[in-house]
């Protein structure tokens, strides 16, 4: 690489195949994959880097294009996957902690209100970025404070949930961020009741979603006043198949890679669905799956 990389304590890996990391099993190579040792290491990288920086989490809601990711791709590792109690109704979690682990940890601590997270296969950082939600609840309703590093200046900031300016599947912060820690609020409850709610969340997910397939969660956000899956279904796209990827018959807002599809195959199929909904309803669906790369 012609441009030198900042001296850091974390780990650089070069020309990393992203198809082995993503839930959809697609994507080209990342030029450089970096896992920081700690917050200071991350800040140092951002302040000194001469290459563009991208951020990935669990890659459970992402299509990485076949040409891969140029520059430096940051992925928080186990050093940021901690979950700990602050008091009897609050939990602090690192950006790399899985949302499902957070839900079950809360249950073990007899803290209720986070059960819906058990069905979301992403990280705390990714969930904060997209205001992840399920079954009528979302991150905005349970997060208190968030710590984030700005990807432009490399400085550390703290925000309240109100300062984030959350809305459906997004937030209002200007600029680009990597979310490294958050404090979540709940209410004290009995363990058996929480366990039952966790079971209900997982049962509902298993019954309504293609959990055994290669997928990346919901393809599109719900437009105001309607459900994306219903628009897709009524546009004749349930089960739409291009030979390597298809729209799930079980839940038609899910895209499946079932026969070694490429990222382009998946993206093209999603855009066919967008076009069909636009033609029938004059509604422009917005991708919920994040598309990354050239």
UniProtKB/Swiss-Prot annotation:
Recorded coiled-coil stretches: none
Active site residues per record: 169, 218 (proton donor), 288
Subcellular location: Cytoplasm
Protein name listed in UniProt: UDP-N-acetylenolpyruvoylglucosamine reductase
PANTHER family tied to this protein: UDP-N-ACETYLENOLPYRUVOYLGLUCOSAMINE REDUCTASE
EC numbers, comma separated: 1.3.1.98
Highest taxon above the source species: Bacteria
NCBIfam families given in the database record: murB, PRK13905.1
GO biological process: cell division; cell wall organization; peptidoglycan biosynthetic process; regulation of cell shape
HAMAP family assigned to the protein according to its UniProt record, in alphabetical order: MurB
GO molecular function: FAD binding; UDP-N-acetylmuramate dehydrogenase activity
Role played: Cell wall formation.
Cystine pairings recorded for this chain: none
Sequence ranges assigned to domain FAD-binding PCMH-type in this UniProt record: 26-189
Keywords linked to the UniProt accession: Cell cycle, Cell division, Cell shape, Cell wall biogenesis/degradation, Cytoplasm, FAD, Flavoprotein, NADP, Oxidoreductase, Peptidoglycan synthesis
Gene name of this polypeptide: murB
Catalytic activity: UDP-N-acetyl-alpha-D-muramate + NADP(+) = UDP-N-acetyl-3-O-(1-carboxyvinyl)-alpha-D-glucosamine + NADPH + H(+)
Pathway participation: Cell wall biogenesis; peptidoglycan biosynthesis
Record family assignment: Belongs to the MurB family.
Main location: cytoplasm
One GO CC annotation: cytosol
Cofactor: FAD
């Amino acid at each position: 690489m012609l441009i030198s990389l900042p001296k850091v304590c974390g780990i650089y890996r070069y020309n990393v195949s992203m198809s082995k990391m993503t839930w959809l099993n697609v994507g080209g190579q990342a030029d450089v994959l970096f896992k920081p040792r700690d917050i200071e290491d991350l800040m140092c990288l951002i302040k000194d880097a001469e290459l563009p920086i991208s951020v990935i989490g669990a890659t459970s809601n992402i299509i990485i294009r076949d040409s891969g990711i140029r520059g430096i791709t940051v992925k928080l590792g186990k050093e940021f996957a901690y979950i700990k109690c602050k008091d009897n109704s609050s939990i602090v979690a690192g950006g790399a902690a899985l949302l499902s682990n957070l839900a079950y940890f809360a249950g073990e601590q007899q803290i209720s209100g986070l059960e819906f997270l058990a069905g979301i296969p992403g990280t705390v950082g990714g969930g904060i970025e997209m205001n992840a939600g399920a079954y009528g609840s979302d991150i905005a309703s349970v997060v208190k404070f968030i710590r984030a590093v700005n990807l432009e200046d490399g400085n550390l900031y703290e925000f309240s949930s109100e300062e984030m300016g959350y809305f459906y599947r997004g937030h209002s912060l200007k600029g680009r961020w990597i979310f490294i820690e958050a404090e979540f609020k709940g209410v004290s409850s009995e363990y058996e009741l929480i366990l039952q709610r966790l079971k209900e969340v997982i049962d509902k997910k298993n019954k309504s979603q293609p959990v055994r397939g290669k997928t990346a969660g919901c393809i599109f956000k719900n437009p105001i006043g309607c459900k994306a899956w219903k628009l897709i279904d009524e546009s004749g796209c349930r089960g739409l198949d291009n030979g390597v990827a298809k729209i799930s018959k079980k839940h038609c807002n899910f895209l499946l890679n079932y026969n070694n599809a490429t990222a382009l195959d998946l993206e093209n199929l999603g855009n066919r669905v967008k076009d069909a909904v636009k033609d029938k309803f004059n509604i422009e669906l917005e991708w919920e799956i994040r598309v990354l790369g050239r």
